[in-house]
Amino acid sequence: MKRKSWELKLIFLVLVAVFAIFLAVPAIRLLLKSFLGEDGLTGAYYLDVFSGKGFTTALGNSFAVSIVSALVAVGIAFVMAYIIHYTRLPRGFKRFVQAVATLPMFLPTITYGFAIIYSFGKQGLITRLLGHQFFDIYGFGGLLVGYVIYTVPVAFLLIHNTMGYVDKKTLVVSKAMGDGTLSTFWIAILRPLLGTLAGAFIQAFFLCFTDFGIPASVGGDYEVIATVLYNEMLGGVPDFNRGAVISVVMLLPSIVSILLLRFLERYNIRYDRISDADLRRNPGRDTAWGLSGTVLAILILCMFVVIFVVPLVERWPYQTGFTLEHFQEVFSDNELQTVYLNSLGMALATALFGTLAAYGAALITARSKLPGWCKQVIV
């Protein structure tokens, strides 16, 4: 027992050191950079940024598109999770819905931008098939579509996981008590999920607020705070002090998010025992939810079909003949092969060390008898 306690303490110290070196120290240096000028401490950089042309507009744009995107993403994620847990649809269909819901998380966000362009642009695949462009892809519309696809997997995993721990017999009890459909839906499904739904919204909002890949490809003239930061740090004349100010502003929502998530934990419902009840047969319910899941799955897949179609076309959209020339060019380019191998190596290393860190943190917070303050530090 003593050995186990010693091992957990060692894991705790290693995690604290890792978080301090790679998270706390850079954050502190960033904060100091935003206040330190040639003559010492100053707030001039903050005044300069907030009074500058376009910053407040970009900040407002970021909040607007992030809030709307997060709301839509949580709604879609809820529907797809509901189909899996609260319908009697075939198991194969449920697995298909789950696979589609998590598919976008395996692609980088800048890929979503290209997928939107090649799908919904004036010469996009879907636009050409339907003969009409439904929305302007450069600006709010493109950002909304990209952000929603980007954040649906995270919101889905949170809601899907929580639904698995909701006692299904609450549905039976609510019906036995004579509650109406809406009352049962609130009591047995929505009420136990309130904390998770709010948490999913916060996570989706923060991911949208800080993402750069999607605005870089389809942002257009609709400037958001991520593109402002890029222009300050990697523009013609980098300004690290102003960039630090913008970075601090971007970090503030994450701090608020953490505080809100801590607050929302008190609304989570904990069951002494979870029991699973067979859902009643309801063809109308299953048909409606099945159609909803099918439509959502098709819309998500349509976004990514073009990624597999365009590389096999001679010259999209003018020469649509089949060719493998593009693949041959890529695989024969030694520099691209080196870049690909470097990316693969970094991804494997990140996955390995990230998994170890997450597992160690889970051991400390859920399976150790260390003091409460130790667990709070990790969380």
Regions found by a protein language model. Give the residues of each.
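Short, Lys/Arg-rich N-terminal segment immediately upstream of the first membrane anchor
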Residues: 1-7, 187-190, 279-285
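Peri-membrane helix termini and adjoining interfacial loops of integral membrane proteins
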Residues: 34-44, 119-130, 219-227, 266-275, ...
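Alpha-helical transmembrane segments of integral membrane proteins
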Residues: 259-292
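Interhelical loop and adjacent transmembrane-helix boundary motif
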Residues: 4, 43-55, 138, 209, ...
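Membrane-water interface segments at the C-terminal ends of transmembrane alpha-helices
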Residues: 7-38, 53-164, 192-213, 245-261, ...
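Cytoplasmic membrane-interface regions of multi-pass membrane proteins
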Residues: 86, 167-173, 266-276, 363
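Short helix-to-coil transition segments within interhelical loops
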Residues: 51, 163-193, 368
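Short amphipathic alpha-helical coupling elements at transmembrane boundaries
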Residues: 36, 44-48, 95-98, 168-176, ...
